[in-house]
């Protein structure tokens, strides 16, 4: 069913991706008319709406790819940070919705060697304007506190591996615990599955 909201989304998607067309969203036949070639028995099988996973959306990367921070990493260059306007707009909408629901927001930047000082400063300004907290794992202060070692804690230049993710998670957990009034639900019956999943995760990853 076409609505004003759906129409606005279609216009934004097609403007951002030239491979997408308005017609294919308004008239699905244009998008799926070749689908008959791909249909198989799996398409007839019912699928659960939710799939349980002990990883909770996390992908642990065991491989180690020795890296080195680029020369001048996170030092001022005078360049202007540019962000996708659509991404910023939707971030603003998400923050506004969270505030409406009484949910505190923390903007988080995870380790990435292509990050820059200017982008970090721009995001910090954006967070201040939105009235939310901002944590940047690429600032020297937090990198030092976390203890990330580019020689062993990275999967590639844009992702930490399993050991790196443990360091990041421990720091972030401590930060959230010390900064916000978060209840500890460990051991509570209503959250028992989380305790079970944690133990299974630790055993699977060898972190136990």
Outline where the language-model segments fall.
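Secreted/periplasmic serine-hydrolase-like ester/acetyl group-modifying domain
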Residues: 1-101, 188-208
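C-terminal regions of proteins
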Residues: 117, 121-207
């Amino acid at each position: 069913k076409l609505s004003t909201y759906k129409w606005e989304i279609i216009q934004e998607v097609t403007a951002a991706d030239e491979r997408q067309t308005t017609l294919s969203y308004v008239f699905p036949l244009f998008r799926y008319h070749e689908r008959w070639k791909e249909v198989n028995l799996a398409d007839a099988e019912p699928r659960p709406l939710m799939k349980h996973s002990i990883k909770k959306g996390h992908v642990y990367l065991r491989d180690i790819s020795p890296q080195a921070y680029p020369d001048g990493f996170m030092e001022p260059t005078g360049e202007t940070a540019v962000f996708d306007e659509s991404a910023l707009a939707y971030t603003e909408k998400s923050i506004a919705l969270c505030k409406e629901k009484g949910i505190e927001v923390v903007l988080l930047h995870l380790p990435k060697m292509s990050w820059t000082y200017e982008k970090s400063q721009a995001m910090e300004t954006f967070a201040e304007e939105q009235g939310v907290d901002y944590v940047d794992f690429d600032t020297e202060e937090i990198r030092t506190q976390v203890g990330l070692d580019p020689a062993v804690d990275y999967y590639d230049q844009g992702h930490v591996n399993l050991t790196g993710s443990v360091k990041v998670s421990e720091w972030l957990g401590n930060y959230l615990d010390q900064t916000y009034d978060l209840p500890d639900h460990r051991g509570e019956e209503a959250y028992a599955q989380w305790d079970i999943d944690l133990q299974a995760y630790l055993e699977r990853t060898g972190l136990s």
